[in-house]
A protein has these predicted regions:
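Ferredoxin-reductase
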Residues: 2-81
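Short, Lys/Arg- and Gly-enriched loop/turn segments at beta-strand edges
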Residues: 45-52, 90-97, 230
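Local cysteine-cluster metal-coordination motifs and their immediate loop/turn environment
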Residues: 113, 205-234
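FNR/FR-type flavoprotein reductase catalytic core
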Residues: 69-207
Length: 243
């Protein structure tokens, strides 16, 4: 974990409620895909944990959805704003377990961390495919970015406006894969448990207070006792959480 100041160099809407923010600063503490950062926003006491969509040596890309006061403040922050950011939080995904053809599953705001993971898997010479779940066509984001990596992109929309009508599970049941990685809400994970045929990793979106393990506000029950999503996760093996 490292604390530093980052400058907003991009902050724009991708959909009506989903925004892309690019921050410039020292990203050296980020060592794995699937980690998250904690932002201190103006006039807010608690930091806001946001998953990392992508990063390089000098920039950090975050994709966030306006769901409350904090993210509404984020959407209005002008370019040039300096933010206090904790980077390098969480464990991230283990790509050594993926096999040659893993499937990446993202639902809603669980989509962003899948992007950097996909880039890493492609760089390792593997052949991932991605399944993205949204409510409707107007809510789709990042699909073209995934496609630009040269990997298959499957989309499920609840209303059938794009891709498969239904949920990610309606796509997954017809796919072949060696392993899976996922990020999304618990209802999606529970539905996936009915169709997934391999081992895999789930990244949880539990509500966090501190973001680094002190407040115990994001604990979940696992096969090895209670674990903190922010400190012990957010990524857990399938066998740990759905034994």
């Amino acid at each position: 974990m490292k604390q530093g100041f980052f400058t907003i160099i991009e902050n724009k809407p991708l959909t009506e409620l989903v925004y892309k923010m690019v921050l410039e600063g020292d990203t050296s503490a980020i060592t794995n895909c699937g980690q998250f950062v904690d932002l201190r926003l103006p006039e807010k006491y608690l930091r806001r944990p946001i998953s990392v969509c992508d990063y390089n040596e000098t920039t950090l890309t975050l994709i966030y959805k306006i769901v409350g006061e904090g993210t509404a403040i984020m959407a209005k922050l002008p370019l040039g704003t300096r933010l206090d950011v904790l980077t390098g939080l969480g464990n991230g995904y283990d790509t050594s377990l993926s096999g040659d053809a893993p499937v990446l599953v993202g639902g809603g705001v669980g989509v962003p961390p899948m992007f950097n993971l996909a880039k890493k898997l492609v760089a390792e010479g593997k052949h991932p495919q991605v399944v993205l779940g949204f409510n409707t066509a107007e809510e789709i984001f990042l699909a073209e970015d995934f496609a630009a990596l040269g990997i298959p992109v499957h989309i499920a929309t609840a209303d059938g406006s794009v891709g498969t009508k239904g949920f990610v599970t309606d796509v997954l049941k017809d796919l072949n894969y060696t392993y899976f990685y996922s990020c999304g809400p618990m209802p999606m994970f529970k539905a996936m448990e009915q169709v997934m045929t391999t081992s895999g990793q789930y990244s949880f979106e539990e509500r966090m207070g501190c973001g680094f393990g002190a407040c115990m506000g994001c604990t979940i029950q696992t096969a090895n006792g209670y674990k903190r999503v922010c400190k012990d996760g957010p990524v857990f093996l399938r066998e740990e959480v759905f034994a």
